[in-house]
Every structure is written in structure tokens, then in C-alpha cells.
């Protein structure tokens, strides 16, 4: 079953409901852009259609979209790099493209340091139409606000929401009661996206069920019910239904599951779960690259159904999940690790994050393979926070602190002894260690120092049919180091 919020996302501005005045002002801004060349801020509550309107406008105008969203690091350097890419694309294509900067009011986090000033420069210097999207207009800097026009999207009235829900029911061929649609519209208080999610959550056996029936969306506890459903209780199909009932986007669901799965899964379950999360991340990357939001459904399939399907047994009891994932520190930590892996393996940062990091997490889970964890820490120059992120162990624990100290000693020794380099001693040790272990352990240890390629890697390159396969970034580069 597809996500109705994506299946029925407006494709033209004429389909944007409940904000006719804002829609018309936005369209007027676009058509007159050659004359004024100013950026515009679309602001208003979540779920009122700001992002949908931006993409619908791009379709109407025939403009390709280049988007920077909240999941991207938005430091000064990243925004300047993004601006350079936008300018480059415009030069190559020769036409207009729409630049979308999502959550422009959320640049106060540590990882976005310098981002507000860089974004202000971007909108002032842009040679392409720029749309900034914000929930809270006054959370943005005064300099950024003064550099842009603004269009306010107001909360969508229940009177405007009901026809949307009715149209979806007819398209999906499900029975409905007008009173139930009115109830859903009023309960969501201007949030059209939330109303559509509620509608889908209440659909059972070709009928929209009334409040209190099975499937009604709980807006206060739904994220933790979702975690329990995926990680502990429900089948793959049931977990997917729960995912559709949660008022969160697939990228946010991915962050929640990725952050909490080590609290419940372990061993093969955890490794298999990371496989599905990596696949979900690939689909989300395609959404960012193509702006085709129909791919969201495949990301959700992996995050919910995929992770639930690899669970070997149901679990009861209460789990201390903790609060929401801390995006600023968590993402900056992951970005650093992915960058170090990418530099070492000769792959892109995206490939390192999607394809390699999940394997590292599985192989070094809770530092069970201490030698491998030390070797990894030394190779990628990681500190306690990075080791804790990868292994799931606390950064202040004795084992993590000991691993970091041993890795530092290994780096210092290698700096003095230039004969074999930093990893040669580790490989020599590994050869003696693996005499009594199976071949898989030998291959795993080789990831952190072997100079001679494994037979698997050679065979993989031959099967690819290209001599420079390892230099290409096809989404699989670097995996042979860990197989």
C-alpha cells in the first residue's frame, strides 16, 4: 500500500488546496522573477502545503529542482558548495531551475554553524529563483528575511480539507461517512497532511472507520507505538500500516529506527536491520536527487516492514527508548565517520554512509570484536564519541576509552616506525590470530590493513567487466573491503 500523502501530492499549483491567496501570490512571484530576481520565503504551520506548492510550481514552470533539506548538513561550507553546484547546473543547462531550501528557520543548531549568514549571501547573489521554506518566519535572521519576499500559508480550514479527503476516498474506492471526514478534518486543526494520514490510518476493509476504531492515529504517542510495532511486536505488514499512521516523514522515521534499533536488536537481527536501513537511505537519496517523492514508499517499506521482518521473535516488556534522535550531534558524528571512511576507501561519502558504515556497526557491535574495533579506530582516527556511535556502546565506558587509548598508541607507534606503515603490524597480528578462526574473520580483519586484494574482490572486479571498477562510485564501491 502506498503512502496517500505522496500518492496524492499536488503536481500542479491548481491542485494546492486551502491557500488560494498564497498560491496565487507564489505563482505571481515566479512569473515576474526575471524582473525582480528576489528569493521568496514560504512560511506557515507544518502540513499546510508549502513544500508541495514549491514542487508543483516547478512542474508548472518546467523548472528542474535542486533542493537542500533538513537532513543535509548546512554549514557555511556546505551551503557555499550547494550554491556553487546550483550555479554550475544553471551554466550547463542554460535554463532556469528552482532552488529549494527546506527548514530555513532551523539553522541555529551547532552543525549548521555559519549557515544563516551563508544562506543570506546565497539568496542575495543567486542567479536562479530561490524558495525558502519555514515553519516559523521570525526564527529566521532579520538579514535573511529582509533579503526575501514572503508568502504566508495559513492553516487549512476544515471546509477545505474535507473535499480533499472525499476525493481520495473516491480514488481509492473506499466507503466513507461525511461526518467521519468532517471529524478528521477538524481534529487535525489546519494540518492537511496530518488529515490525509489519519484518513489512511482509519481505512480498514474498504471503509473509513470512525474515531476510536482500530487504526485511528494517536498523535501524542504514535512515534513510540511505531517503535514498538517495528522492533518488538507487529508483523511486517502491520508495521507498515503503523508507519503510514505516524505523522512523520520517511527520513524522520529512518532516524528514529536507526537510533533506537540497537536498544532492541543484536547480532544477526541488527545486521539485517541495518541492511534495510541502508536500502531506505538509498531510496531517500533518490528522492533528493530526482525530487520524485513516490520513492518515499520504498524507503518506508524498508524502514518499517523490512526491519520488522528480520525480527526473529516478538518481544514484550518496556524499552527505554529515550528522547528524539539528536540530529545535530548525531549527524555531525556520522558525517565525520563517513568522510574518514570515504577518504580511506576511495569512495564517495554517501556510499561510505549507506553501504560501509552499517557493516562496521554490525561487525563491531558493543565492541565484541575488540581487535577489529581498535584497528578501525586507528585507521579512521576516531575518538570515543565516534566509537560509541558505531558500536552502540557508551562513550564513557571503560571498554570504549581503552579502545581509543590503544588506537592512539598504535598510531603513535606507526608514526615512529615508517617501515610498514600504520596498518602493517595490525595485519601481521591478524594473520596469526586468524589461524584458528574461520575465513570470514580473516576477510573482516583485512578491511583494516591488508594491502593485497582478496580473491573475492578480484573476482568481483572481473565480473563487473571493467578494469577500473574500484575507482567508480556505483553505490557498491568499497564493499569488497568488508566481505
Swiss-Prot record:
Biased composition (Acidic residues): 430-443
Listed Basic and acidic residues bias regions: 451-463
Binding sites annotated in the UniProt record for ATP: 44-51
Record keywords: ATP-binding, DNA replication, Nucleotide-binding
Keyword presence, Nucleotide-binding: yes
Database matches in InterPro entries: AAA+_ATPase, ATPase_AAA_core, P-loop_NTPase, Rep_factor-C_lsu, RFC_lid
The keyword Lipid metabolism is annotated on this UniProt entry: no
Biological processes, Gene Ontology terms: DNA replication
Pfam families for this protein: AAA, RCF1-5-like_lid
Region (Disordered): 415-483
Alphabetized SUPFAM superfamilies for the sequence: P-loop containing nucleoside triphosphate hydrolases (SSF52540)
GO molecular function: ATP binding; ATP hydrolysis activity; DNA clamp loader activity
Function: Part of the RFC clamp loader complex which loads the PCNA sliding clamp onto DNA.
PANTHER family: CHROMOSOME TRANSMISSION FIDELITY FACTOR 18, REPLICATION FACTOR C SUBUNIT 1
Record family assignment: Belongs to the activator 1 small subunits family. RfcL subfamily.
Subunit structure, interactors included: Heteromultimer composed of small subunits (RfcS) and large subunits (RfcL).
Protein name: Replication factor C large subunit
Gene that encodes the chain: rfcL
